[in-house]
């Protein structure tokens, strides 16, 4: 709705949509004016019609003369809705002298009721134009002087819902302090005008040369207004506020003539003197409010005019006119930059660069951007509109070199130059985007806020008498309200009213505070902190690439940069020179020409403050980390300087790892390095070449590496100290040094006991230990006191505090002991640990007897370390000191065990018994998981002490407890002095307590979980150790009893013979007890673990310190110590695994036991009178499992003839079933063979054969060798067994079950209930029936028309005599069965490969060209052993290659022309005998070039008589006679007398259309004969399988008829068509006798 006061005059008029009343008088809501009217108003500001007030209100030049109202076109409700959706408007601030608000309603509805005349108004406008005051403000001031008659009340002034109440007040307000000015956040309105404001292009200020003698803040910069000549300049001031706010008051300027030859954008600025409005508040209340809002009254300097006050002193709602000020740049989000960055935008004396794009070359770039309504927007002088710099889409072709600058595609180089020339503020993200898209030779890096200030410009400003400020005073921002942002460019082309005295005072106050702040920052930079406290240098990711490209020349289009005033970001005051540094430029003479220099800031690096944790030292890897030289400085502060060489690595991670680890150190060299004390925030201006900059970068990298090496060196020194202290303490406790200890270790370990016991000499003893030379380390630490001083001065705060705490603990006379270190007071098993490595052999270090596993030496590494360094500090590497050789067990040297004295052993055993009651808590120190799992951990029981001793230990200070430890049994002297590990444990405890107060991090939680798992693992190890020790004690007690008995017998009888006899008897008793145990009890005994140390039954080992480590890898087995040599092996031998026979016996026993239980349960259920359904189901299941037959299965009873008078014989138990002989034969159906041999064996038993088992095995093996297929074997073995049974029953008479005995007939029987003929089944022999009686019975087996079509029988459509149609089946649906004459491609029916005929139509022959399986797939095995195998070779399906080979491919595809050669059977004639005939036929085919062809036709009747047997010669060449299936040879085919035509003639003599033909898969026979017939009985469909598939005739014969046909795979005899036809006849008779066998077919037919 809002047009903004400019645009096309005829396209938009608000009066056509909104009423005049009540919002007409608000500026910005009047009718729009075009650009020409705006130009006239700007060029003639002194006219009565061109006042800014009218321009703001949107009225035309003659709006004041119009009196006729404008007709309304919409309702008031519609107008209100439109106003609510419009952008929020804020009226122009009214000057101080005027307090009355504008009354829009009175100005529009009653224009004649004004208090002054038109002539007075014109005069006021002229005076205001001469004095620089807007005419409307002058008119308002004059009206206020006349009176307040027209002041509206609060109810009369219409207010919007979005306007605050403070808009009605016109009292100027003092600005807030600069640091407290809040940033206005733009409100994204839904109105289009608000969206256009947010997307408004950024306005770039134009900087022009400064006139001599004029301060920068007094210059009003000008740019050319739209559609105005080059000589007309208009000032534009920004208006900050909410999105959609109204513009400030405008002021038109006189045109300034341009000099000849001067471009419009280079025109010199003109200073405009503005006189503030002289007026006072309308009433005393307003004046009082104005005074309350300006509490700080600063006196005006003498000689300073109000219009000379810089614009920074204006208040947020001041009434005084405001001069030009620069608004901070806006980012893409629309938020303003921070107020502190506003003062860094200075005017540079550099001519503007030509615009990148746009029609006008003389105007700046942003002047060409279209406005919200299509008009061009022009930025004002000194105004920085929001910059919107974004990247182009990824698929844009200019994405790598250009950016989207305020909706314009601009090269990144031009944007960089524009930002550098105007000193614009950009954020890091925009700067990174620009640098990424700069050319290679322009990718320089500038810091935030522009470039540093050259010293020559500072000197020039000091010589000119100007204040030596690096920047103009920061612009005084008005208080940003929620609705004060400009909505378009025309609103910002108004001049703020002049400053008031209070605002000028506030300006001076702010300038004074800013200068004091700068002086304070300069003082801070002159006294910089030490170098070691400076932060590390942070370089951008692309800095290295920018440095390499910085020395290349700049392109020709970039103008040379002239040193200008730039802000100082580091806080250095502008009136003082920068601090001296090594990078300051050399002073040049005044005659020398200024050359462009590469100005880059240099910030002195500060090493990071990384805390050093002594309790968790960093474990370094000797193979990955290298430190060449470690030197110690003598001057204060003492620092450890580390020199490293950069390894050549391919990645940063490898370099970091390789630089962090120490290697063998060289000789000690003391070196001093000069360090420059430079403040961390000091900016150093360097004008040196690229080589110096590169050297500087390398120095930074070296400094970083030195800092990292310093950290590692400190950790190494602390670790060495701790190890040496522990060695010294250990040497003190163990006075006797082993003989095989090296000389260097002896030198370190020899410390007098008196010195270690005395509190005052403990430090000297440690010092003496530290000063001893070492053989392998090259760094020599002089004394502990001196080194502690060095460490106190290390500039690392956290590590310094922790180190001081550790040192104080070491220097205390009574160190605090860890409350959980009670395990040091007992003797426990030594721990031996080893490290896993992929390259090195594991090195084992023994744990001392009196040292606890909680010590830091045995603690795990920090969880933050790498996996390669997680071994722990307890591993002794190859290059460690010689003083640790006593703890290392080599590969070739034996393990020596320390012996305990008898008192210690007794005391340890007594404490072990009381361990369950008084058991100390376990340590929470995390240990390595692998080490805790593999290394056995000793017990932690305390020594037994009396109550008095415990009471004394509580009263004794912590430091003296270890000095007063005594044994309750023998009151010996105190053992040892406290070691360094106790102090370390105390510090660790204090640190843990502190860490509990703060919330735990993720790493700490994981560490606690890890410690908990380790404690659980340790508990399990202790339990196993206790059990082993209990067994050992039991064994020792038994041995002690035996010894005592021997001693008693020796004392009683001094004869040695009696003693030896008693010993022999005792050994015999033990052996007898062992033999008395049964085998089952021995198997149930729990075997001892193999990895435990074997116990001895012959001797007692007093030291009890055997070492055993389970070897994880066989490659390191030689380095792992073996078991104790003094211990015998385990007593119980491991039982061998049972063999196959034993396993079978065990399974048979279990099976028999289960069958016995099932029989008992079945018998119990049978004896019950009443059984439930569940019990019946259970009985059926048991009967099935036991194979119990409930009823008689046979209908005939067989009676054996027995010799009369034969005595009754006792029945013998059934002999065992023999095993099969050869497992290699029929390996796929072994289970079937085992079942079959049992049947054969039972049959031979019935024959009373003397060697039934052997005969049964041989008989079964012969059948298995003959039939290699499982299915054939199962069928034939059944036939053979049936034949054997018939031979056995040859002498037994069969008696019919329904027959009546002769005695009953003679006796007569009861006549009343005679049931001779009732219910008797009569058996009909269908074979004896005549054909006339048999024909009606066979009609039910005929195939229907749908079945004929489905099974691909040749059919004629609608009685047509043309070509027949043959449907596709599941076997032929993926094959093209009928081909065109020109098609030469074929598919082989055997190998299923595609081949082509020769061009002349013949077949190509080649040796072994076709490899195939001649039999189908058989399914063998049950569900768990289900396999598909070929019946021909018994190989696995889809895996084995073909077992047969042929020289030619064959096919069953036919030409399409063959479909027209089919003939139908003749139509029956009256009284035709052929109509009642039934024949069974079978055909044999051979392969020809034209496909399968008929070679033999055989037909029989139902009485099994041969009717027809014809041999047919095919019309084309025969490729393969297919002898193995057809049974025909090439000689028979070539000598065949008949052809297909003669065969048809012979066939039709017996067959007509009503004759029933029987066959198996008869559709293939009819296709070969080329005959169409519908009365068909197909045995393949009649006896289908349950899976609805066809069953082979051979299988049906064996299964139903128990007859084998078609020979075998191996004999290659082939099929006999006569045999197949007779088999079909037998199957039909079987179906008549057993109608249930064809029920499946009927069900399928009904479906």
UniProtKB/Swiss-Prot annotation:
Keywords for the protein's UniProt record, in alphabetical order: Coiled coil, Exonuclease, Hydrolase, Nuclease, Nucleus
Compositionally skewed regions (Polar residues) per UniProt: 143-170, 736-756, 1038-1054
GO biological process: negative regulation of gene expression; rRNA 3'-end processing
Pfam families per record: EloA-BP1
Coiled-coil positions: 686-726, 1142-1187
Alphabetical list of InterPro entries matching this protein: Exonuclease_RNaseT/DNA_pol3, REX1-like_exo, REXO1-like_dom, REXO1/3/4-like, RNaseH-like_sf, RNaseH_sf
Family: Belongs to the REXO1/REXO3 family.
Task of the protein: Putative RNA exonuclease which protects neurons from the toxic effects of expanded poly-Q disease proteins. It is unknown whether this is via participation in the pathogenic mechanism underlying poly-Q-induced neurodegeneration or if it is by acting as a genetic modifier of the age of onset or progression of neurodegeneration. Regulates gene expression in neurons.
Protein's name in the database: Putative RNA exonuclease pqe-1
Native source organism of the sequence: Caenorhabditis elegans
